[in-house]
Amino acid sequence: MIRAIDKFHELDKGVMGVVRAADVYALHVIAKIRNQKIDMDVINSILSENKISGLNLVSYAYTKNELKQLEEKGHFTEIGQQIIVATHTALESYLILKFREYYRHLTLGNNEGIVEETLSRLNFRCLNDFKDAYKKFFKIHIPSFDVSYHSSDGCNFEPENSWEALILIYKARNDIVHKGVSLDYKVSTLMDSWYPFDFVRRWVSGFDANFDSHIYQNRETRLYREYKERAISNGISI
């Protein structure tokens, strides 16, 4: 069976491909707005070296007038929203497969047929379903797990903590899929899709390493101890 983290990396690679395609498109759009020639050296580095341009990372890559135009005309909105949907898909896949990994590990020696039947009956329809199931079966309180993260000035991705970030991404995905557009979270520049994607990569990496140590080795990392203290201080029994 494919490991959750390996599947995530596979999906992550696909999302990164869309990010790079959006980057190339963005460079053409910005060059047209500025009435400049396209920087083919930058495009070649994106295509051949798996790099991204500063348009994804910093607000000062755009002028105020450019930011206004991008928001009004929505040049990057549709492709940025698809990056957010794909990011959510990768995250959801990881959480489902990780749950199965931990459940199978903790039920080793039990009737395999019953274990698999139990897993087949579990249905994760929303973020709170993951929160409840991880807490019930593994005493993992997802809202208390926080990774250090920051975005750039001018980016609309400004969650106060990791749980708020996950909720933002989940809601944006639902709005895009069911209503055609993200209503509360604006996707105007490449930063608005890059930073949610980059956050999920960091969150999954941290979650996988720290909870694997706890579940498989009964070892508490520094980040796990911080998570535990945070949960207990909020009255959560873990």
Region annotations inferred by a language model:
Residues G14, A31, R100, K136, ...:
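A generic structural signal for solvent-exposed, polar alpha-helical segments
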Residues M1-L11, V15, V19-A22, K32-Q36, ...:
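Intrinsic-disorder-associated interaction segments
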Residues M1-L47, I52, Y103, E229-I238:
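Terminal, compositionally biased low-complexity regions
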Residues M16, L27, I43-S48, I96, ...:
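A generic signature of intrinsically disordered, low-complexity regions enriched in glycine/proline
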Residues I2-K13, A26, N161-D175, K179-I238:
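Polyanionic, low-complexity intrinsically disordered segments
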Residues V29-K32, Q36-I43, R104-E112, E116, ...:
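Short, surface-exposed, charged/polar-biased interaction segments
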